[in-house]
């Protein structure tokens, strides 16, 4: 890959992975508009590692508490709030994992098109706007039930359709279910960790089995740039979301969807 391709694509992945604007919609733009080649499996693995590093470092304290609480519940020493959240995250990951295993080939073959991505970018952008305009509720992470987590998990499975936006659809579902904006985003970001691990691990296995040549400079740069940009986005999104709401992202998605249709 050319250096400029590595820089641009890594920044796109890092910036868009955790914002509700669809990373796949943005990654297809250089290919459709500029004629850039596909970034390849190795680079996909690299940016997965980068975004996973960002969210794991940002939520390191939460992750530590969740792991300790979950282990306590497993060993019969009682289940606290963090332990329950750990179980909820596991349960909410199952739908996306199953759907990914079953429908991965179908999605890659038939749904990774500009038309599909443009349509889902528009449709789920409007849905995000509707969810954000609901009467405000103050339900927090400690208030959610297993059923709430499972519904958000099912919504995450829908994000396997390119253009949906994993963070966008999970935040949308959480808002519909009454979570405040900040905790809707926090649950979405925590839920991304096992999904990125599974997706990145699967792609990593494919890479190993393919025995393809690896450009280690591109890999290292991709990891670093996607990690730093994703970390910055998580930080500012969580700090400003209650003030700015979802409307700026909705407007952006609508403009992006129209641009994609024009680019076809």
From Swiss-Prot:
Annotated Gene Ontology cellular components are: plasma membrane
Name its species: Teredinibacter turnerae (strain ATCC 39867 / T7901)
Query: What general EC class does the enzyme of this chain belong to?
Result: hydrolase
Could you list the residue ranges that cross the membrane? 1-21, 39-59, 87-107, 111-131, 144-164, 187-207, 208-228, 244-264
Catalytic reactions on record = di-trans,octa-cis-undecaprenyl diphosphate + H2O = di-trans,octa-cis-undecaprenyl phosphate + phosphate + H(+)
The record's section on Pfam families has:
BacA
Q: What protein am I looking at?
A: Undecaprenyl-diphosphatase
| Name of the gene encoding the protein in the UniProt record | uppP
Q: What is the lineage of its organism?
A: Bacteria, Pseudomonadati, Pseudomonadota, Gammaproteobacteria, Cellvibrionales
Instruction: Quote the HAMAP family the UniProt record gives.
Output: Undec_diphosphatase
* Membrane topology according to the record: Multi-pass membrane protein
The UniProt record lists the keyword Transferase: no
Q: Which UniProt keywords apply?
A: Antibiotic resistance, Cell inner membrane, Cell membrane, Cell shape, Cell wall biogenesis/degradation, Hydrolase, Membrane, Peptidoglycan synthesis, Transmembrane, Transmembrane helix
The GO molecular function terms of this record are: undecaprenyl-diphosphatase activity
């Amino acid at each position: 890959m050319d250096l400029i391709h590595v820089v641009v694509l890594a920044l796109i992945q890092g910036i868009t992975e955790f914002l509700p604007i669809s990373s796949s919609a943005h990654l297809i733009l250089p290919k459709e508009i500029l004629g850039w080649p596909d970034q390849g499996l190795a680079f996909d693995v690299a940016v997965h590692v980068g975004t996973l590093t960002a969210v794991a470092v940002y939520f390191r304290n939460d992750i530590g508490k969740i792991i300790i609480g979950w282990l306590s519940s497993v060993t019969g020493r009682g289940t606290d709030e963090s332990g329950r959240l750990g179980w909820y995250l596991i349960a909410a990951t199952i739908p996306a994992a199953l759907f990914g295993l079953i429908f991965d080939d179908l999605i890659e073959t038939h749904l990774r098109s500009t038309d599909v991505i443009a349509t889902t970018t528009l449709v789920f952008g409007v849905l995000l706007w509707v969810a954000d305009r609901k009467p405000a509720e103050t339900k927090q992470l400690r208030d959610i039930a297993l059923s709430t987590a499972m519904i958000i998990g099912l919504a995450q499975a829908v994000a396997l359709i390119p253009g949906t936006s994993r963070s966008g659809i999970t935040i949308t579902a959480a808002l519909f279910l009454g979570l405040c904006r900040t905790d809707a985003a926090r649950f979405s970001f925590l839920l991304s960790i096992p999904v990125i691990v599974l997706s990145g691990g699967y792609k990593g296995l494919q890479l190993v089995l393919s025995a393809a040549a690896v450009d280690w400079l591109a890999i290292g740069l991709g990891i670093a740039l996607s990690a730093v940009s994703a970390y910055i986005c998580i930080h500012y999104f969580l700090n400003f979301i209650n003030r700015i709401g979802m409307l700026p992202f909705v407007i952006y998605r609508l403009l992006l969807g129209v641009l994609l249709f024009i680019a076809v």
